């Protein structure tokens, strides 16, 4: 085994590509490394096409092995299970730029598997996996029009940073991944801390320029180690069948695309398909339905694109830069913490915001360790949203991807834990869909968060742009329909505030999209975003002043970190008793910050008072109220200050002689006591002599005591 190795510098990192030693029965295999983060990528391509196959069956799987980080998986089975959300998102990140580079009509099955086998906590494996997949596909000999490069771009101290480390990413105002060929950008995925359109475009151009070193080195690697190129030839078009279908369907399809209502248009198109299939298969039984449908789809594309390029109205009658009619309702669900329905044309999202406590945060087990996520965003796309029946179950890849994009759009305006100590979950239920449901989710989420009283920094809106390009002519479309997305050349989603962009996602199906075209699309998207924000601001101009009556109220107080163990108690007994007796939820941070969540304000105040009792220091000569916890022959033990026990000796119960303690005291009895002494072992001696229930007791120590305003803050 003589492996072939290619090594090169990529920004501040060293990239190594190796092939020929492992997985030699795969069509191609590459071990890709970047500074100790290593991803093993394999490609298997079938030489034969399945009979009746009428689509390109490309599968991309990305999997992380815990041994890569020197860890053993948790759980009962102690092995990796189904893909996590993070793994699914990275699989999509690899898939999106490579899929458009396979030729039309190529239907051979291809599977790409990327396995993380070693991880340096400072280097994210997603970029390494993308480079490895590009190299493996290029080596395999399949008709892949790559290679592609991939780059991550950060923005630190007003400078673009190529492939920042994870430490640098924490201080970066931008996390942008761009992939493309030597000639064109194909895919962008990003989140930003409210940057301008010009800064976002500059980041895309910067990343594309920098990744050329990857593309050049993969080309050299292929010259040295690549397999012979497949002699695949695109199937010859069936001209006779195309002409037959055109004669029967072209005029009718043109008329159908004058129907502006989606369902009525689809019914007409389906009727045309059924009629043409029936006529042609009756004449010739060897003609496949799939071939007829492919020709009709091509006719649809030609008609719609031709009209747009010619300057005619779009499918639903709009001009190129018109946003569909908007309708907004907030506070639509009575018992939820915040809700909104956002409708844009035939796309509608029901967004619901829920406030929770620290214990509701999601613990994410990553290769580099556990992390906590305080903002959750879930996107659901039920089949009824497009008038279909279908399976209901765990979220699909598309739902996970759309949810993450919408989350990226809103994340930049979310308050910090110090500003708003709640965990927040937003769920977007897509109730109708005809294009741009992820951007409707951004708008709906912003409205629902404001309805819930979450102090977001600004309202956020999202818009999906499209592009139709024929040779030198091109048209940028605002607020695309589902058909325009399917038949167009670009899907370009932008979310942001009035001040700038918070998220950008781009998928381009053709080469030749210049920075100038992207600039036009960004500027047109900005105009659409401002229009949507104006309508949203009329519906709800600012976050509600107060949270819902049904949301938990979080009160915070500070205690001495050394006293945390006293509040928790042995085996959690004290804190458990507090929560059970008052119906509250209590979280304590290592710095002594105590967060009490309760729907009843009085219950929260009672808990705070009791915690103050627990952490307060017992003072000699101070007088307290307490409860008798035990009666013994030589006296009684009394609990003061929320659990500290002291002894009232038999001689200190009264000035008279006491024969039996039980004659004077019983368990549970409330008494007034004075602290006589605290010895070196912190044992407390108490007396009841010369005291009665009218004697003034020390302040801020009883259950009824109020906590000072400096020690609590009600959020």
From Swiss-Prot:
Cofactor(s) in the UniProt record: Mg(2+)
Coiled coil: none
Region (Disordered) location: 695-715
Family membership noted in the UniProt record: Belongs to the polyribonucleotide nucleotidyltransferase family.
Residues annotated for Mg(2+) binding in this entry: 485, 491
Subunit description: Component of the RNA degradosome, which is a multiprotein complex involved in RNA processing and mRNA degradation.
Signal sequence residues: none
Domain KH: start-end pairs: 552-611
Designated name of the protein: Polyribonucleotide nucleotidyltransferase
Residues in S1 motif domain copies: 621-689
């Amino acid at each position: 085994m003589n492996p072939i190795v290619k090594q090169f510098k990529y920004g501040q990192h060293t990239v190594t590509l190796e092939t020929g030693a492992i997985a030699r029965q795969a069509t191609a295999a590459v071990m890709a490394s970047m500074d100790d983060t290593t991803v093993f990528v394999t490609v298997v391509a079938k030489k034969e096409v399945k009979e009746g196959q009428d689509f390109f069956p490309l599968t991309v799987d990305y999997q992380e092995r815990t041994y890569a980080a020197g860890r053993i998986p948790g759980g009962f089975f102690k092995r990796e299970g189904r893909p996590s959300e993070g793994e699914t998102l990275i699989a999509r990140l690899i898939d999106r730029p490579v899929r458009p580079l396979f030729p039309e009509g190529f239907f051979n099955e291809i599977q790409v598997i990327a396995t993380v086998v070693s991880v340096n906590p400072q280097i994210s494996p997603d970029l390494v996996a993308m480079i490895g997949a590009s190299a493996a596909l290029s080596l395999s000999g399949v008709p892949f029009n790559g290679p592609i490069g991939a780059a991550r771009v950060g923005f630190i101290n007003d400078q673009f940073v190529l492939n920042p480390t994870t430490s640098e990413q924490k201080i970066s105002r931008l996390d942008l991944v761009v992939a493309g060929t030597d000639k064109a950008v194909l895919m962008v995925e990003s989140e930003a801390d409210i940057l301008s359109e010009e800064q976002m475009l500059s980041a895309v151009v910067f990343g594309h320029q920098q990744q050329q070193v990857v593309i050049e080195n993969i080309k050299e690697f292929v010259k040295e180690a690549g397999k012979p190129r497949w002699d695949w030839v695109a199937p010859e078009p069936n001209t006779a069948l195309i002409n037959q279908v055109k004669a029967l369907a072209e005029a009718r399809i043109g008329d159908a695309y004058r129907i502006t209502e989606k369902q009525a248009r689809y019914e007409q198109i389906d009727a045309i398909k059924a009629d043409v299939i029936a006529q042609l298969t009756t004449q010739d039984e060897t003609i496949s339905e799939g071939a007829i449908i492919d020709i009709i789809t091509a006719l649809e594309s030609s008609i719609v694109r031709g009209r747009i390029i010619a300057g005619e109205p779009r499918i639903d009658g709009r001009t190129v830069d018109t946003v569909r009619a908007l309708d907004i309702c907030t506070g639509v669900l009575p018992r939820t913490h915040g809700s909104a329905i956002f409708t844009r044309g035939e796309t509608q999202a029901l967004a619901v915001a829920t406030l929770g406590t620290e214990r509701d945060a999601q613990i994410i087990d990553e290769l580099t360790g556990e992390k906590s996520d305080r903002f959750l965003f879930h996107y659901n796309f039920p089949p009824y949203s497009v008038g279909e029946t279908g399976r209901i179950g765990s979220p699909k890849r598309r739902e996970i991807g759309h949810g993450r994009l919408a989350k990226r759009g809103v994340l930049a305006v979310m308050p910090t834990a110090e500003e708003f100590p709640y965990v927040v979950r937003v769920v977007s239920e897509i109730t109708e869909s005809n294009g741009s449901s992820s951007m409707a989710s951004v708008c709906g989420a912003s409205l629902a968060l404001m309805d819930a009283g979450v102090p977001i920094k600004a309202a956020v809106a999202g818009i999906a742009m499209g592009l139709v390009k024929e040779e030198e002519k091109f048209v940028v479309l605002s607020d695309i329909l589902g058909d325009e997305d399917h038949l167009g050349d670009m899907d370009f989603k932008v979310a942001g505030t009035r001040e700038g962009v918070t998220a950008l996602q781009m998928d381009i199906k053709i080469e030749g999209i210049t920075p100038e075209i992207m600039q036009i699309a960004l500027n047109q998207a900005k105009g659409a975003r401002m229009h949507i924000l104006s309508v949203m601001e009329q519906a709800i101009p600012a976050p509600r002043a107060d949270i819902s009556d049904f949301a938990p109220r979080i009160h915070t107080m500070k205690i001495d970190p050394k006293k945390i163990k006293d509040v928790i108690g042995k085996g959690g007994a004290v804190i458990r008793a507090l929560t059970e007796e008052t119906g509250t939820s209590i979280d304590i941070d290592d710095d002594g910050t105590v967060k009490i969540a309760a729907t009843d304000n009085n219950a929260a105040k009672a808990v705070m008072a009791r915690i103050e009792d627990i952490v307060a220091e017992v003072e000699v000569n101070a007088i307290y109220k307490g409860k008798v916890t035990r009666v013994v022959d030589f006296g009684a033990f009394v609990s003061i200050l929320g659990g500290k026990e002291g002894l009232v000796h038999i001689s200190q119960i009264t000035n008279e002689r006491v024969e039996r303690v039980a004659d004077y005291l019983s368990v549970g009895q409330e008494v007034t006591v004075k602290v006589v002494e605290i010895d070196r072992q912190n044992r407390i001696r108490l007396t009841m002599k010369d005291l009665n229930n009218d004697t003034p007791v020390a302040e801020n120590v009883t259950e009824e005591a109020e906590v000072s305003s400096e020690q609590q803050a009600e959020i």
